[in-house]
């Protein structure tokens, strides 16, 4: 709805996840990192499980997930009170400018990175329909948000599930910025006609 063709964004989102996972796995194997056995807190019972027990387990699991998400949301509110969002904005704004994303799209991109693609994407749709952001900046911003979004919430959730901070935050950030930097330079070689034909649809 914001303009970029869904197939292209889908390729970047799914393909980016697969490629980053592959690269991270190879780096960890090469460095013999994170090779220790994972310690599971919960061990499922072996054997047939009745429908009633399965239903109870699902309710417990969903309740725990809901409690974790509520805790993360509460923590995000606390961090916002202490100005973490403003700090992240000061960090990301010069990075986005150096990537080649125009100033009209930087604030919206930062919102998507911090709060999630649903918030940032919604703002991009509104600004795109109003014609306030150039099409190429919209495209670059959404690709970046597809690769790196909900930086606080997703990171906290993955840490609770046992993820490694370097892989789920810093490595992901480096991969996303590198991908968008390369994309900006390649797309700038494409004519406006080709860009709108293959990457961006024009609103009627």
Feature map (PLM): residue ranges:
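Transmembrane alpha-helix boundary/anchor motif
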Residues: 22, 70-74, 79, 83, ...
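Juxtamembrane/transmembrane-helix boundary motifs in multi-pass membrane proteins
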Residues: 4-9, 48-56, 60, 64, ...
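Alpha-helical membrane segments and immediately flanking helix-loop junctions
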Residues: 1-2, 98-158
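Membrane-embedded alpha-helical segments and adjacent helix-loop junctions characteristic
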Residues: 35-112
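Secondary-structure transition/capping residues
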Residues: 86, 99, 106, 135, ...
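Alpha-helical transmembrane segments of multi-pass membrane proteins, especially transporters
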Residues: 5-17, 82-85, 108-113, 137-145, ...
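Juxtamembrane and boundary regions of transmembrane helices in multi-pass small-molecule transporters
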Residues: 2-42, 70, 156-204
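Small-side-chain structural scaffolding
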Residues: 3, 17, 21, 54, ...
């Amino acid at each position: 709805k914001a303009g970029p063709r869904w197939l292209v964004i889908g390729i970047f989102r799914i393909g980016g996840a697969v490629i980053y996972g592959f690269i991270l796995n190879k780096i960890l194997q090469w460095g013999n990192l994170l090779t220790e056995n994972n310690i599971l807190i919960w061990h499922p019972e072996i054997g047939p499980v009745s429908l009633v027990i399965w239903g109870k387990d699902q309710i417990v699991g969903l309740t725990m997930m809901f409690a974790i998400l509520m805790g993360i949301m509460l923590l995000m509110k606390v961090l916002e009170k202490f100005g973490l969002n403003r700090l992240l904005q000061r960090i990301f704004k010069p990075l986005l400018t150096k990537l080649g994303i125009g100033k009209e799209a930087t604030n919206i991109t930062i919102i998507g990175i911090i709060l999630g693609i649903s918030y940032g994407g919604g703002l991009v749709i509104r600004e795109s329909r109003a014609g306030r952001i150039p099409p190429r900046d919209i495209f670059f911003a959404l690709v970046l948000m597809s690769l790196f979004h909900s930086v606080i919430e997703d990171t906290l959730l993955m840490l609770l599930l046992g993820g490694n901070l370097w892989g789920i935050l810093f490595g992901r950030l480096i991969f996303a910025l590198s991908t968008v930097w390369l994309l900006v330079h390649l797309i700038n070689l494409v004519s406006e006609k080709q860009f709108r034909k293959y990457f961006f649809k024009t609103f009627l």
